[in-house]
């Protein structure tokens, strides 16, 4: 396998190079005419374009994971100062489940179809092993720590080192508490259900 980092609006491939193209949570960040025209260009006749987009899901947190006043103030301050979303057009071109098939057809694809993949991550569900349940909880921990690190990279000038350290400590303490609840059999039934829309079109 070969990995190439490139511009999705100017792919470094000849016309008609591929039988299938797959994009995973990319389309919502790129101007549609530029994105779909490139997908169409690099596909062979009869080739398949698959566009995967995160759809609405369900998120219910355990009480022990609720933000403290310190954390709420931190995130409110970060939201006011950080322009990363606007700067990089994050989610600027997001469309709903009805609009996506229409836009794919508009830019040249035919035989459009859709499907959904649903994944539920509920640590307390007995269908999951203890190892898997702990991995779910820790995955949320890593996501929380990554979010703090993202603020540190984007706007470090607005926060002290002590604030970042405290945010990290609080995040770890919360997820340590959640793991302790799981290990003691104290069920919380917190859950994260992700829904991914797959739109399929043919050149």
Specify the residue positions occupied by each region the protein language model found.
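Conserved SAM-binding strand-loop segment of SAM-dependent methyltransferases
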Residues: 1-10
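Conserved Rossmann-like nucleotide-binding pocket used by diverse enzymes
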Residues: 4, 22, 50
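Structured loop/turn residues at beta-strand edges in well-structured enzyme cores
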Residues: 6, 16, 192
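A short acidic, Gly/Pro-enriched loop at the edge of an enzyme's catalytic core
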Residues: 9-21
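A short SAM/SAH-binding and catalytic strip from SAM-dependent methyltransferases
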Residues: 19-33, 55
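A short glycine-rich, Lys/Arg-flanked "PGG" loop and its adjoining helix->strand segment in the class I
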Residues: 33-48
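Conserved catalytic/acceptor-binding region of the Class I
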Residues: 51-142
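Conserved Class I S-adenosyl-L-methionine
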Residues: 93-98, 113-203
């Amino acid at each position: 396998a070969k990995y190439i980092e490139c511009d999705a609006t100017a792919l470094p491939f000849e016309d008609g190079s591929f039988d299938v193209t797959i994009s995973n949570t990319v389309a919502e960040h790129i101007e549609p005419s530029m994105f779909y025209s490139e997908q169409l260009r690099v596909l062979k006749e009869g080739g398949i374009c698959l566009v995967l987009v995160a759809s609405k899901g369900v998120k219910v947190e355990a009480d022990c994971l609720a933000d403290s006043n310190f954390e709420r103030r931190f995130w409110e301050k970060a939201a006011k100062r950080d322009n990363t979303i606007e700067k990089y057009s994050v989610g600027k071109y997001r469309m709903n489940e009805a609009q996506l098939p229409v836009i794919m057809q508009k830019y040249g694809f035919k035989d459009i179809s859709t499907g959904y993949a649903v994944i539920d991550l509920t640590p307390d569900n007995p269908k999951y092993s203890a190892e898997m349940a702990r991995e779910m909880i820790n995955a949320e921990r890593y996501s929380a720590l990554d979010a703090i690190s993202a603020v540190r990279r984007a706007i470090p000038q607005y926060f002290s080192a002590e604030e970042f350290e405290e945010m990290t400590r609080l995040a770890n303490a919360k997820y340590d508490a959640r793991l302790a609840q799981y290990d003691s059999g104290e069920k919380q039934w917190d859950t994260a259900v992700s829904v991914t829309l797959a739109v399929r079109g043919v050149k």
